[in-house]
Amino acid sequence: TDPDADKGEFLAEGGGVR
């Protein structure tokens, strides 16, 4: 998915920095 969108959702999983 888009890195920008994941930045918020993946932040909790520590994967926001892609």
UniProtKB/Swiss-Prot annotation:
GO CC list: extracellular region
Keywords linked to the UniProt accession: Adaptive immunity, Blood coagulation, Coiled coil, Disulfide bond, Hemostasis, Immunity, Innate immunity, Secreted
GO BP term, pick one: adaptive immune response
Domain of life according to the entry: Eukaryota
Entry PTM: Conversion of fibrinogen to fibrin is triggered by thrombin, which cleaves fibrinopeptides A and B from alpha and beta chains, and thus exposes the N-terminal polymerization sites responsible for the formation of the soft clot. The soft clot is converted into the hard clot by factor XIIIA which catalyzes the epsilon-(gamma-glutamyl)lysine cross-linking between gamma chains (stronger) and between alpha chains (weaker) of different monomers.
Compartments it resides in: Secreted
Domain comment as written in the entry: A long coiled coil structure formed by 3 polypeptide chains connects the central nodule to the C-terminal domains (distal nodules). The long C-terminal ends of the alpha chains fold back, contributing a fourth strand to the coiled coil structure.
Role of this protein: Cleaved by the protease thrombin to yield monomers which, together with fibrinogen beta (FGB) and fibrinogen gamma (FGG), polymerize to form an insoluble fibrin matrix. Fibrin has a major function in hemostasis as one of the primary components of blood clots. In addition, functions during the early stages of wound repair to stabilize the lesion and guide cell migration during re-epithelialization. Was originally thought to be essential for platelet aggregation, based on in vitro studies using anticoagulated blood.
Subunit (UniProt): Heterohexamer; disulfide linked. Contains 2 sets of 3 non-identical chains (alpha, beta and gamma). The 2 heterotrimers are in head to head conformation with the N-termini in a small central domain.
UniProt protein name: Fibrinogen alpha chain
Source organism (scientific name): Lama glama
Gene: FGA
